Amino acid sequence: MSNTYQKRKASKEYGLYNQCKKLNDDELFRLLDDHNSLKRISSARVLQLRGGQDAVRLAIEFCSDKNYIRRDIGAFILGQIKICKKCEDNVFNILNNMALNDKSACVRATAIESTAQRCKKNPIYSPKIVEQSQITAFDKSTNVRRATAFAISVINDKATIPLLINLLKDPNGDVRNWAAFAININKYDNSDIRDCFVEMLQDKNEEVRIEAIIGLSYRKDKRVLSVLCDELKKNTVYDDIIEAAGELGDKTLLPVLDTMLYKFDDNEIITSAIDKLKRS
């Protein structure tokens, strides 16, 4: 997907969202059945923000509808809408059941993401996310496995490490990327993780490769040194890569970073990385 297309899509979503904010609840409810997916999502997001018993009730009804599009939008709304405490268990259980059993892979993926959002609001559901992921991590659907990696990133539980290592080897780049992100954000570390990251230094997916570089650098694994050095010499260098150079703690990177001071405008990040290396 090109950056131009993504920008246009984001612009449309932003415009539709602002339009939906001006509508009353009944008008938003009707838009949930619109043929335009962007209108459905925009109205759902406004309903999430507003909350209210009617919106929650309708979303729950949608979750058991014969139409998979309705089930999908219902699961999406329930992920982040404000609900009363006594309703939390019921809503999570509905989403959990959909994540495991819905016939539509699209709905399962949305339900998984929504269980993660509910867990963000109430970490008591972390064990259920772990249990759920033991099944969904092996789903045939790429979207479901990607959603699972995202859900695992929300919790911190070492029981998920074997699942994440398996997802690091997934044939799909988005799945690998989210699995690597989940490992890095939770600061998991063992020899299997590091070895996987070393293999991923040659990944064709740039985002996956960047996560691997960051992961190895923060773990002070010098096997990343040559690849990191090559990244720093490119015409376009991500801030995360510069920060990773500082974290690796190898002073041989100092000349490369010094050269970058005269090449890029954002000297603060580069200077910070240089200072870290000098102190290491």
UniProtKB/Swiss-Prot annotation:
Q: Could you name the domain of life of the organism this protein comes from?
A: Bacteria
What biological-process terms (Gene Ontology) are attached? DNA damage response; response to antibiotic; response to radiation
GO MF annotation terms? oxidoreductase activity
Gene3D superfamilies, alphabetized: Leucine-rich Repeat Variant (1.25.10.10)
Spell out the SUPFAM superfamilies in the cross-references: ARM repeat
TM helices/strands, residue ranges: none
Q: Which InterPro entries match?
A: ARM-like (IPR011989), ARM-type_fold (IPR016024)
NCBIfam families named among the record's database cross-references? PRK09687.1
- The protein's name in its UniProt record: Protein YibA
